[in-house]
A protein has these predicted regions:
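Extended, hydrophobic/aromatic-rich amphipathic alpha-helical segments that build helical scaffolds
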Residues: 1-13, 33-48, 55-95, 125, ...
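A conserved hydrophobic secondary-structure block that centers on an alpha-helix together
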Residues: 23, 49-52
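Short linear capping/connector segments at secondary-structure termini
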Residues: 15-22
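C-terminal substrate/ligand-recognition segments
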Residues: 197, 201-323
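Short, mixed-charge aromatic SLiMs
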Residues: 22-27, 93-101, 322-331
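An aromatic- and glycine-enriched ligand-binding surface/loop that stacks and positions planar moieties
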Residues: 64, 69-243
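Long, intrinsically disordered, low-complexity segments
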Residues: 36, 108-181, 282-292, 318-322, ...
Length: 416
């Protein structure tokens, strides 16, 4: 319900079971949606037992975490101080429950051994997935395969490069998502663990033996050695010379213009945290649970909610989190001061931590930064983004299906 109203605004709100064909659609306000959202969450908080969700079911902890997110979202829209305060209280309840904790090594957060949300230390709520071919409809030619598609959607086109062929380790290159230059440059990999865990920038020659054509392009290439290296910075002349006979080297200026527009759309630094080395060669799903809410978001919600009323506590919370993501020995370098904690810093931190987890558009909408950030950082969309994009268009098949077309119309700004 939160996703529906935040995506499309004043649309149809059903609170009773539908028993027959309904051909008319009538809008309900965002306020009506949030009344139901908060009422339902209050029931869950009051009636469910506290505890970690170990099986994909809702617990009191999950309800509190969702309500913290909903309170912050609604507070940003209405400016209600009580909603900001409640968001902070709920988020801190989860933080202080001692049922969730951070991995010392960030790579453990995304290790396939910790992909089960029921046992992952940072996961508050997750959608359960499996590697079962039967449960993922692999044997039904008429059905759409289910399962977590994160294993393939972020993978760049590596299998046409010299020395490379498609394999399980590198996954199927569906290349649906490409990181922006802006996102890559948000990370300081000298002090922050997350860049090297989140992204993949090197691919190793997996052909054995290498073909004649491979060695014609790179005569010093060797199986098991580097085949592709993509840099988030500019390469030096010496790096280019070294690579010229060994592997394909792409630096940030090969992949993007200086303004951030993509030059290459098939080769890029790959968002890699959803990789599954246990997957089967020809499948496009994996066993990873999808983490819907994780512990870091509680820190971000609390810090943002207290930004205007208790900034020092907000800074303390943010620093507590940042030190957990620091490279050992670099904890003090990761810490920030009160003057550095702004809504833009929080958004940058959310990008560093939550990229690829399908929450960014909602974050930018909530903070009324969507148009500003797209104009600054998305060169493909900057000339077209407008305020009406704060709502997404209602799917045309929904509009076609209703009989009261003059009353239930497309969201403002979109062509009918």
């Amino acid at each position: 319900m939160w996703l529906i109203t935040e995506t499309w605004g004043d649309v149809v709100l059903n609170t009773e079971p539908i028993t027959g064909a309904v051909t008319e659609a009538h809008r309900s306000s965002v306020e009506d949606f949030y009344k139901v959202i908060f009422d339902d969450l209050d029931v869950a908080v009051n009636q469910l037992a506290p505890g970690k969700s170990t099986d994909g079911r809702i617990t009191q902890d999950v309800a509190k975490a969702f309500k913290a997110r909903a309170c912050l979202t609604r507070a940003c829209a209405t400016g209600e101080a009580s909603l900001y305060a409640e968001a902070a209280v709920l988020a801190k309840d989860i933080i202080n429950s001692q049922r969730y904790s951070f991995y010392t090594d960030y790579s453990d957060m995304w290790d396939i051994a910790n992909c089960d949300g029921g046992t992952n230390k940072e996961a508050i709520f997750s959608i359960n997935y499996t590697n079962s071919e039967l449960e993922n409809n692999a044997f039904d030619a008429t059905a759409t395969n289910s399962g977590n598609k994160g294993i393939v959607d972020f993978v760049m086109k590596y299998d046409k490069e010299a020395g490379m062929e498609r394999d399980v380790l590198n996954a199927r290159p569906f290349q649906r998502y490409m990181p922006s230059r802006y996102l890559l440059q948000l990370y300081n990999e000298n002090i922050d663990q997350r860049y090297k865990v989140t992204f993949k920038d090197a691919w190793y020659a997996n052909k054995n033996p290498l073909s004649e054509s491979d060695l014609k392009v790179y005569p010093l290439m060797a199986t098991g050695d580097t085949a592709i290296y993509i840099m988030k910075t500019a390469a030096t002349d010496s790096q280019k010379v070294w690579a010229s006979k060994r592997y394909r080297l792409l630096d940030v200026n090969d992949v993007y213009t200086s303004e951030g527009k993509a030059i290459l759309r098939s080769q890029f630094v790959e968002m890699h945290k959803f990789a599954d080395p246990t997957a089967v060669y020809n499948q496009d799903w994996c066993q990873r649970d999808a983490f819907v809410i994780r512990l870091p978001e509680m820190y971000f919600i609390a810090a943002e909610a207290m930004l205007q009323t208790n900034k020092q506590e907000a800074v303390d919370l943010m620093n507590e989190f940042l030190m957990k993501r620091a490279i050992p020995g670099k904890e003090n370098d990761m810490k920030i001061t009160e003057s550095e904690l702004t809504i833009d810093f929080i958004l940058d931190e959310r990008a560093r931590e939550l990229c690829g987890e399908q929450i960014r558009w909602f974050d930018l909408k909530r903070t009324k930064k969507l148009v500003e950030y797209v104009k600054l950082h998305n060169m493909d969309a900057k000339d077209n983004i407008q305020e009406y994009h704060m709502l997404r268009p209602i799917p045309q098949n929904q509009l076609d299906a209703v009989t009261n077309k003059d009353e239930f119309t497309q969201n403002p700004g979109y062509t009918k």
